[in-house]
Amino acid sequence: MTEYDMVVIGGGPVGLYATFYAGLRDMKALLIDAQDELGGQLVTLYPEKMVYDVGGFPGILAYELAQQLVEQAKMFSPDIRIKEWADMIERTQDNMWVVKTDKGNSFKTKTILIAAGIGKMTPSRLGAKGEVEYENKGVYYTVRRKKDFEGKRVLIVGGGDSAVDWALTLAPVAKSVTLIHRRDQFRAHERSVKQLYQVATVYTWHELKEVRGDGNRVTQAVIFDNRTKDEKILDVDAVIISIGFKGDLGNMPKWGVNMKGRDIIVNAKMETNLPGVYAAGDIASQEGAPKLALIAVGFGQAAIAVSVAKKYIDPNASLFAGHSSEMDKFKK
């Protein structure tokens, strides 16, 4: 069994940065992520949206930021496993940990950093007829690449910020955009809703009944007025169902880490109640400190957790790695 200095659980921005920082500290690292692609919410929820609150980037597409984080994480050649769920952790007799996955694999490690965010993300589905049949054949739950919708007739289902933002984003490139919402009040920002009515056809009090197609792609959608039950058939090329994502932490609450709701309780060193186990990012909650779900905050927490873990492994190690600009490993 391969032994690691650190296993990082979660491949979002914080997990990726932690993996990089572990390499910077000369720690053999393994990154495990349950999603199909590294990047966390950046790629799963809003890859085509701009991110403005990460230092050094006045504005960057979420997907591009994720790609740069992945590139940085791979700098010191960590082992990476995606589409694999960290199912259980167990303490060994020699004071190490074994991380067991849903694929039946076991990884022995000196420390663990949990950066799982909200957990494995799966889209909320409506259960409309044809929805599952045409998933990824015209039915989508987010916009991965805006160019995929160029010249297409798009139907968006939802009334929150994501649904309205996608409508505004796609309107300039799509042939047409129609948005339906089951109520007449939107959860989205008021200004965005006003813009929505200028660029899209909007049906309030309407829901999706059925998605139709030719077996290979979507061709129509059936919507209905939930007050009168009157139906409309729309010719569409794509249906984006934007009603949210669910986060699943799996068996994590059974691992023995102290949790409050969905948060893992940590101290100022990002330590949990378990020796050698740390948490950072959205999943970490530090008592007495404000909780800010910001990528920038998570980066700092990851650096602290990795540095403390380094000293846990080697008490003689320096807590501070030094400035990267002065490290030989970065000099060519």
Curated annotation (Swiss-Prot):
Keywords: FAD, Flavoprotein, NADP, Oxidoreductase. FAD binds at D33, Q41, Y46, A86, M121, D282, S325. Signal peptide: none annotated. Its EC number is 1.18.1.2. The keyword NADP applies. Its cofactor is FAD. Coiled coil: none annotated. It is an enzyme of class 1 (oxidoreductase). Homodimer. This is Ferredoxin--NADP reductase.
